[in-house]
Every structure is written in structure tokens, then in C-alpha cells.
């Protein structure tokens, strides 16, 4: 019976499992969205949630705790500068797991783990970029029309 047995083994020894989870957590924080297996996504979710909770209290101690888990200094910087402020008023539930179906090669069930709200940030950035391109095209079109009129 599995009473009070928490966590996932992921067919690895302790060091390999910890390394995998640290790498996944770093990737989620840097990219804000990754595709992996459902089990790995469920295993890394508590770690990512804890890192964001640390980022909400921006102290030297919390930065050092996050740096002990995350692999790159850039991910720690992004965590505290961007994500900590973004999720400042939110009490948990910072990640979302979306199932994607089986992987073609081995049939493993795939899932996307993403930070809640990252799709809004990316959508707004894409919208601004498209608007700039449209305005630029309109300006070039006017410039071209003025040249042909002369």
C-alpha cells in the first residue's frame, strides 16, 4: 500500500531525479512553457510553485535558496525581477498543466507545463509587434504613393 508516499521516482536514483527536477524547473522559469511527459510535469510543478513563492519575498535569503535549486543566474534574476512581481497578489496556482496526447515515438503521454499568465504576456507582445509591422507597412505604402504622384 502507498499510504503517505509522496513524490515521483521517475525511474531514477535520488541524485538523477533531483538533477532532472532542477533542470526542468530552470527551463520552466526561463521559457515559461515547456513540453514534457505528464509525470515529469506533475513532479516539477511543486518545485516551480515553491520557487515563485520564494520570489514574492525578495530577500537575500530567498534569492540564495532559489539559486541553490535553479541552474543559471539568469533564471534567478528573471524569477525575482519579473515573475515575483507578476504573481505578487496571487496565492498559489502559478502553473498550469495541459495534456497534449501521446508522443509519436514511444507513446508516452505528453503535457505542457506553463506559467499562468504567460500566454497573456506573449499574446500582448505579439499583438504589439503585429501592430508595429502594420503601421510600418502603411507608412511605407504612403511614402511609395507620394513618390509615384510626383
Swiss-Prot record:
Coiled coil start-end: none
Pfam family, one: Ribosomal_L17
Record's keyword annotation contains Ribosomal protein: yes
GO molecular function: structural constituent of ribosome
GO cellular component: cytosolic large ribosomal subunit
Annotated keywords: Ribonucleoprotein, Ribosomal protein
GO biological process: translation
Keyword Ribosomal protein among record annotations: yes
Region (Disordered): 126-150
PANTHER family noted in UniProt: LARGE RIBOSOMAL SUBUNIT PROTEIN BL17M (PTHR14413:SF16), RIBOSOMAL PROTEIN L17 (PTHR14413)
Membership in a protein family: Belongs to the bacterial ribosomal protein bL17 family.
Quaternary structure annotation from Swiss-Prot or TrEMBL: Part of the 50S ribosomal subunit. Contacts protein L32.
HAMAP family named among the record's database cross-references: Ribosomal_bL17
UniProt name for this protein: Large ribosomal subunit protein bL17
The species this protein was found in: Solibacter usitatus (strain Ellin6076)
